Amino acid sequence: MPGLPDQPVTAGDLLTLEELGDFRRASTLRGAGLVLHAWGTIGAAVALYVCWPSALTLTAAVVVIGTRQLGLVVLMHETAHWLLFPSARLNTWVGTWLCAAPVAVDLREYRRSHHQHHRHTRQPQDPDLPLSTPLPLSRPRLALALLGDLSGWTALTRIVGWRPRRHGIAPAWRRCRAPLIANAVLFGVLTAIGGWTLYPLAWALPWATWYQLVTRVRNIAEHGMLPSVDDPLRNTRTIRAGLLARAVVAPYWVNYHLEHHLLVFVPCWKLRRVHALLLRKDLGPRMECAASYAAVIGQATSANGPARA
């Protein structure tokens, strides 16, 4: 099929009504499988450290668990769009208690803010704009930011900088009630498995370090150094991710971000098919596709052009 005109692309330009229905359809089985995979991977990493405690297994657990904590955020993002399950109630319950609360995120607030992000991507009204600006940075400044993530400094500043009085005590309690309950449950479970030190080592430490790092890398990669235009092929980036990148940086197809912005109603596990569809329709030259996460980080420390695949 010849390439589409050089103008913003819509779902109707790409899909028939039958294809739209197929791409839009969520699956309870697939949604449950993804949540079970995230928590199963976390459990396996915890078991590795408990059975063979050492600096090496702890480091591996921190990386694996920190990445799956980002994975929980990715799955929470799916529930924010009502895409993880066909049931709205199930999306909200699972999104709140099994995805958002364990990593100290409020699903209701995220859903409200994230829909604004989609309406105003890379525009002044975009609430996520500060996450990908100002870029590019000098190598020392970006290295310092990444070191702050790995050292736990970023997490500490976020915790210390949170002020209940900004929103009032009652709203603040509503925001942190679910995270407190979820983490109390995690503390109890991990304490029963390996003693009270297991929670700080196997949950808080990954969250305070590797999770912060991969979250920053994700934010830079998805929208950093891109123009403020109303075209998801140009204001959002997809990143090629091999097996290693998917294991430690980009879980659950989060690297297909352009495809998500273009067809926001498509569940994450179908985004790879959307990517293939765009290439078949000769849209590849118009798409912002980076060769790797390393390539995007390299671009973030230079004034060079886009890190295209």
Predicted regions span which residues?
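Non-catalytic, topology-defining segments of multipass membrane proteins
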Residues: M1-G66, L75, A100-A202, C268-A309
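Active-site-flanking alpha-helical
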Residues: A45, A80, L84-F85, D230, ...
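Small-residue-enriched core segments of transmembrane alpha-helices in multipass membrane transport
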Residues: V64-I65, Q69, A204-L213
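Long helical/loop segments within the catalytic core of UDP-sugar-dependent glycosyltransferases
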Residues: T67, L150-L156, L244-V254
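Histidine-centered catalytic micro-motifs
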Residues: L72-H81, Y110-R122, R218-M225, A250-V266
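Aspartate-rich (DDxxD/NDxxD/DxxxD) Mg2+/diphosphate-binding motifs
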Residues: E78-V94, Q125-S132
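Membrane-interfacial segments at transmembrane helix termini in multi-pass membrane proteins
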Residues: L213-R246
